[in-house]
A protein has these predicted regions:
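Short, cationic-aromatic polyanion-contact patches
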Residues: 34-44, 59, 92-111
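A short, conserved structural fragment
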Residues: 83-92
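Short helix-capping/hinge SLiMs at alpha-helix to coil transitions
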Residues: 39, 52-55
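A short acidic, leucine-rich amphipathic alpha-helix
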Residues: 62-68, 81
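Pre-recognition alpha-helix immediately N-terminal to the DNA-recognition helix
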Residues: 46-50
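Short, Lys/Arg-enriched N-terminal segment that forms or immediately precedes the first helix
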Residues: 22-38
């Protein structure tokens, strides 16, 4: 899973990197560009991702309570992570439950 080649000329590098990761036991890996990775690697967002890796909260509110942050702040972080395809929502009819969209998230090679 990568970004559009017309927008990002490093798409081939990310695609090849994802293929190598798959061959070495890391299927379903999202490979982010360096620029996009900067949007993910904030302490609070990493805390949210760590929690989602271990738990399946029933709602954004439940996640916010679990990580000890304001629901609005967590909701905005989740929206940003969803735009990057890092997080998705499962709608169970009562609430949107945030989940990791991929088993792994990596960053393209820096050099």
């Amino acid at each position: 899973h990568t970004e559009d080649a017309d927008v990002d000329p490093r798409l081939a590098v990310r695609t090849a990197f994802a293929e190598v990761l798959t061959q070495h036991g890391f299927p379903d890996t999202l490979v982010l560009s360096r620029e996009r990775a900067g949007e993910v690697f904030h302490e609070r967002r990493l805390e949210i991702l760590d929690h989602l890796a271990e738990h399946d909260p029933e709602s954004v509110r439940a996640l916010a309570k679990a990580v000890g942050h304001d629901k609005g702040v967590v909701s905005r972080d989740l929206q940003a992570l969803a735009r990057l395809d890092v997080v998705e929502y499962v709608d169970d009819g009562r609430a949107k439950a945030p989940r990791l969209a991929h088993d792994h998230v990596a960053v393209e090679p820096v050099v």
